[in-house]
């Protein structure tokens, strides 16, 4: 049986007929995101509407002032409604060494471009709430939605950073 759970995880269950005792059971035989496979941190809403996940746990709430303790009220900062002067009224804060459920590959996004160019593109885009920047290729990937940020493993330190838009 294939099941899609409310948190976005995909499960496969196998029906086992147990000989002798007559108790038959459904057993989970696969989960797309699990401690055995891809980290649960890559589930879009692992940490609710926003948060930083590391080692299968929600550990922080990224804010313009830095990482704060995570709770279920953690959310993206508000951005001003769009008008001609919006770009001047927004800033960005950096969350280092993270990605989300959409892995940023070598050729994903636009570029090469500098971080400031990517900030301008996001500032000019009404739906952009932030972007992911791949440092090794100077690639920019705008995001209209950001939920759980997954901390990258130590071997990927310095590879991808998120820049979150906020109202100054």
Regions found by a protein language model. Name each.
Residues 1-168:
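Beta-rich ligand-binding surfaces for carbohydrates and other polyanions
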């Amino acid at each position: 049986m294939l099941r899609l759970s409310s948190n976005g995880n995909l499960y496969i269950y196998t029906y086992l007929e147990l000989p002798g005792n007559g108790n038959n059971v459904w057993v989970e035989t696969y989960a797309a995101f699990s401690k055995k496979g891809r980290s649960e941190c890559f589930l879009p809403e692992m940490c609710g509407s926003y948060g930083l996940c590391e080692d299968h746990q929600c550990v922080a709430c990224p804010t313009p002032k830095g990482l704060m303790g995570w709770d279920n009220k953690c959310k993206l900062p508000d951005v001003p409604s769009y008008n001609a002067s919006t770009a001047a009224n927004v800033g960005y804060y950096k969350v280092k060494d993270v990605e989300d459920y959409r892995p940023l590959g070598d050729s994903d996004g636009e570029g090469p471009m500098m971080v400031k160019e990517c900030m301008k593109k996001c500032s000019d885009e009404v739906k952009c709430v932030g972007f992911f920047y791949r440092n090794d290729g100077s690639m920019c990937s705008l995001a209209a939605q950001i939920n759980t940020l997954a901390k990258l493993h130590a071997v990927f330190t310095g590879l991808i950073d998120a820049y979150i838009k906020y109202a100054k």
